[in-house]
């Protein structure tokens, strides 16, 4: 059964939606690479300074897994295309983020990157052995 989500409207999303079934966030997470080797992920500006951090902590692991997948897929770049992909993967949480600004800062960041056409870097942080 297909799940309905509220997409961020964009020219590129039609191709994404037509190329595969629309899945919910948990289903999307199940398809992404493992993150057990990470302690977190930094989002960095053009100077390499961390402007956002996602820890490997309860309540943040889904976002960490999604952002790590974006780092892999987009070679460490967080640009409008990567942000669009991330918003598709966040699925039903995007509508909740739009209705409650600040409740989902990791989604808010993707919306900002997309809307402002930002070019940031994703830096996964290895866990200590």
Indicate residue ranges for each PLM-predicted region.
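A cross-taxon signal for low-complexity, glycine/charged-rich
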Residues: 1-6, 11-16
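Short intrinsically disordered terminal tails
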Residues: 19-20, 129
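N-terminal, charge-rich interaction modules
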Residues: 22-37, 52-57
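N-terminal, charged low-complexity regulatory/assembly segments
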Residues: 25, 50-54, 65-69, 97-100, ...
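A cross-kingdom feature marking charged/low-complexity
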Residues: 33, 38-49, 112-129
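Amphipathic alpha-helical interaction modules
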Residues: 42-80
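Short, compact, well-ordered microdomains
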Residues: 84-128
């Amino acid at each position: 059964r297909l799940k309905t989500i509220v997409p961020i409207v964009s020219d590129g999303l039609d191709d994404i939606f037509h190329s595969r079934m629309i899945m919910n966030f948990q289903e999307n997470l199940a398809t992404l690479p493992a993150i057990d080797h990470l302690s977190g992920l930094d989002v960095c500006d053009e100077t390499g300074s961390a402007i956002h951090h996602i820890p490997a902590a309860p309540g943040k692991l889904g976002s960490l897994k999604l952002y790590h997948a974006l780092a892999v897929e987009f070679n460490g770049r967080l640009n409008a295309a990567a942000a669009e992909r991330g918003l598709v993967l966040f699925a039903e949480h995007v509508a909740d983020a739009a209705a409650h600004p600040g409740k989902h800062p990791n989604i808010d960041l993707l919306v900002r990157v997309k809307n402002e056409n930002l070019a940031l870097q994703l830096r996964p942080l290895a866990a200590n052995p």
